[in-house]
Amino acid sequence: MTSKVRKAVIPAAGLGTRFLPATKALAKEMLPIVDKPTIQFIVEEALKSGIEDILVVTGKSKRSIEDHFDSNFELEYNLKEKGKTDLLKLVDKTTDMRLHFIRQTHPRGLGDAVLQAKAFVGNEPFVVMLGDDLMDITDEKAVPLTKQLMDDYERTHASTIAVMPVPHDEVSAYGVIAPQGEGKDGLYSVETFVEKPAPEDAPSDLAIIGRYLLTPEIFEILEKQAPGAGNEIQLTDAIDTLNKTQRVFAREFKGARYDVGDKFGFMKTSIDYALKHPQVKDDLKNYLIQLGKELTEKE
């Protein structure tokens, strides 16, 4: 097994029911944060981290993802002819990425989506990046979380899962770790991984947040994994099994995480990102200040 992490897997086969009717014909991952689809943030994080090849696991009604990262000759020609070089650079940026696509024919859970990447990954360590979690998108100087996991792997040669503290009453929405003692420099040894525990049963408030660096042995486990929570093949359950034969670490993320998996999180992310966007930040800031005054006066 090579020691270098070169490949990333982005599961994008979910139905996106929380955003209906917008996602009836449009992939949820293509919903824009101001002017950039959420999946492009994920791909850019991977490339910034040094990932060389990316596999996107898609499903039905996800063709728009492939189209976004494909060339569009008519659009590119039009922008070039009109001298819109800045826009042309933005379009070119989406087509210069080494992306591959495979379809998950039946939505049987995250674990099954990752299993579709077995042939692509081969006998190499790899990263799984979930599209609902955007990391540090308003801080260009931050070290990407994926890069942090890759750096950990260079030292430990072990699977490493990203975690961060969440409110105790929200742990049932996440996979949660039971750490072995105190972490060292934000890196924890893990006793067990538990998928979506009830708050009273949660071993900690350290929740898995959508970035995983895994060794290829995970595939053999996923092939035998019985359905878990929600009657789906749960990646967290497979990682817990892996942890019984290989050490699995948890890296505590201390940056800014944005959850775009629900409407409020998506709106909050859009506002925070827009307040850093050079084309709209000033107007938006003034609007929010005025809106705040109006709302205060109505109370």
Curated annotation (Swiss-Prot):
Catalytic reaction equation(s): alpha-D-glucose 1-phosphate + UTP + H(+) = UDP-alpha-D-glucose + diphosphate
Family annotation (InterPro entries): GalU_uridylyltTrfase_bac/arc, NTP_transferase_dom, Nucleotide-diphossugar_trans
Top-level class of the enzyme under EC nomenclature: transferase
Example GO biological process: UDP-alpha-D-glucose metabolic process
EC identifiers of the protein: 2.7.7.9
Xref: CDD domains: UGPase_prokaryotic
Taxonomic superkingdom: Bacteria
Annotated pathway: Carbohydrate metabolism; nucleotide-sugar metabolism; Capsule biogenesis; capsule polysaccharide biosynthesis
GO molecular function, one term: UTP:glucose-1-phosphate uridylyltransferase activity
Keyword Ubl conjugation in record: no
Keywords: Capsule biogenesis/degradation, Exopolysaccharide synthesis, Nucleotidyltransferase, Transferase
Family: Belongs to the UDPGP type 2 family.
Record's protein name: UTP--glucose-1-phosphate uridylyltransferase
Taxonomic lineage of the native organism: Bacteria, Bacillati, Bacillota, Bacilli, Lactobacillales
